[in-house]
Amino acid sequence: MRIEQELKLGFKDVLFRPKRSTLKSRSQVNLTRDFTFKHSGRQWSGVPVIAANMDSVGSFEMAKALAEHGVMTAVHKHYTVNDWADFVKSADNATLKNVMVSTGTSDADFQKTKDIMALSDELIFICVDIANGYSEHLVEYVERVRAEFPDKVISAGNVVTGDMCEELILAGADIVKVGIGPGSVCTTRVKTGVGYPQLSAIIECGDAAHGLGGMIIGDGGCSCAGDVSKAFGGGADFVMLGGMLAGHEESGGEIIEKDGETFMKFYGMSSQSAMDKHSGGVAKYRAAEGKTVLLPFRGSVHGTISDILGGVRSTCTYVGAAKLKELTKRTTFIRVQEQENNVFGKEK
């Protein structure tokens, strides 16, 4: 047993230090990034925010809506191949280039991924997703997927430390998904005691990945636009959002009427709700590591994503970054013990 004494930080522990800026308006900030990926050699241009591959977030409807903003969607893995075929027929190329095909690591998942990727050459992103990215099986599976799809962009995770980040990139991942336990409906940290403060995870994994020419997705932990900016400032190439994009008409969640109000069900992908729906319940050897909540119905996602991107633009103006690419270079975090004045609580 050993204890690491170094302080690890989450988004709530820091604020940006403002810096002199020549920008006159948020409208001058460019949030589009141009990436060339290490293994596939593929190029992509867009706003590097991703809707999470959760049942009640990463839907086909969400993909079409967010593509209008240049934003990506990691479509959840529970759609059938026929569902994908219908989507590919109805979606334009601008949408398809901003979609990730999510998969698990079984032989059936591998065959399903092959069938989906064969539907269109415009599908270029594969998201290999398991809760514990420290499994040797994941490394072997990434190698298998890379051998089958040498020209596709592969994301794999989730991990929170530089060593495993490097191993996945060397195995063939272009992007590593970073985050264990920070999600709004994730209970892994309290159920298992395992986790890592998200900002420190992003900083450390980003440093490791960039040293090898790879990239990272900061997955989870964002509760407001300022957190999205902090993830980018800490070195995330992409930021994945679940709870912030849940509860919308495009989210695909179950709508529930209660006491005259409309709610949408939102749950973690290791929750009792998810396992009841997709796995016939929680296996005897497992424990649920997610919770189910009812969110007030929030209408269309367009207003929400515009608000998030507007917040990130505003961050850039405060620190003098004309492009999102410059944000991490312009970032100085200060440690704090408070974030906001809560005299009046949340706005109704």
UniProtKB/Swiss-Prot annotation:
Catalysed reactions listed for this entry: IMP + NH4(+) + NADP(+) = GMP + NADPH + 2 H(+)
Assembly, per entry: Homotetramer.
Top-level lineage group: Bacteria
Binding residues annotated for K(+), in chain numbering: G181, G183
Similarity field: Belongs to the IMPDH/GMPR family. GuaC type 1 subfamily.
Organism field: Vibrio parahaemolyticus serotype O3:K6 (strain RIMD 2210633)
A Gene Ontology molecular function term of the record: GMP reductase activity
Segments traversing the membrane: none
Record's keyword annotation contains NADP: yes
Binding site for NADP(+): 108-131, 216-239
Record: active site: C186
Gene3D superfamilies: Aldolase class I
Matches recorded under NCBIfam families: GMP_reduct_1, PRK05096.1
Pfam families the record matches: IMPDH (PF00478)
PROSITE patterns: IMP_DH_GMP_RED
Keywords: Metal-binding, NADP, Oxidoreductase, Potassium
Function of the molecule: Catalyzes the irreversible NADPH-dependent deamination of GMP to IMP. It functions in the conversion of nucleobase, nucleoside and nucleotide derivatives of G to A nucleotides, and in maintaining the intracellular balance of A and G nucleotides.
Protein name (record): GMP reductase
Gene Ontology biological-process annotations: purine nucleotide metabolic process
Gene that this sequence comes from: guaC
A GO CC term attached to the entry: cytosol
Class of enzymatic activity (EC top level): oxidoreductase
EC number: 1.7.1.7
